[in-house]
Amino acid sequence: MALQRTQAFLLLLLLTLLGLGLVQPSYGQDRMYQRFLRQHVDPDETGGNDSYCNLMMQRRKMTSHQCKRFNTFIHEDLWNIRSICSTTNIQCKNGQMNCHEGVVRVTDCRETGSSRAPNCRYRAKASTRRVVIACEGNPEVPVHFDK
């Protein structure tokens, strides 16, 4: 419980620093960074089962109008995720060269195919695997989960 509070505090602190302009991606990059955080970052280690996916997909607003078919939650602290942006650039799926890869703990949530929004249902798969994220800005921050 104390670890969760600490991680939540650190995330809140970072968001506050962003708001104060002390860590300053551009406005467009900031919006994309905030979206990345909302859709993909959950430092809790409680992921891994179907109930987790059902709850988190709804909480993070990915089931309002239609069921998002697939989403990955990264279970690492924000600094570990941001450090991926300092690794060697690799090519993204769209051909751009602003992607980076790292190995992290994740929960992949895949929609079952038989549910309808807003009552979407997901199957979970927890693993430690290689991920590819796109980063932008100065300093670079993650803005897109590529694979």
UniProtKB/Swiss-Prot annotation:
Top EC class for this record: hydrolase
EC number(s) on file: 3.1.27.-
Disulphide linkage map: 53-109, 67-120, 85-135, 92-99
UniProt-annotated binding residues for dUMP: 35, 40, 68, 71-72, 145
Entry annotated with the keyword Isomerase: no
Protein name (database record): Ribonuclease 4
Keyword Signal applies: yes
Signal peptide: 1-28
Cellular location(s): Secreted
Entries under SMART domains matching the protein: RNAse_Pc (SM00092)
Protein origin, superkingdom: Eukaryota
SUPFAM superfamilies listed in its UniProt record: RNase A-like (SSF54076)
Family stated for the protein in its record: Belongs to the pancreatic ribonuclease family.
Organism: Bos taurus (Bovine)
Molecular-function annotations in GO: endonuclease activity; nucleic acid binding; RNA nuclease activity
Pfam families named in the record: RnaseA (PF00074)
Residues carrying Pyrrolidone carboxylic acid: 29
General function of this protein: Cleaves preferentially after uridine bases. Has antimicrobial activity against uropathogenic E.coli (UPEC). Probably contributes to urinary tract sterility.
Gene Ontology CC: extracellular space
Keyword list, A-Z: Antibiotic, Antimicrobial, Disulfide bond, Endonuclease, Hydrolase, Nuclease, Pyrrolidone carboxylic acid, Secreted, Signal
One GO process term, biological-process aspect: antibacterial humoral response
Entry annotation: catalytic residues: 40, 144
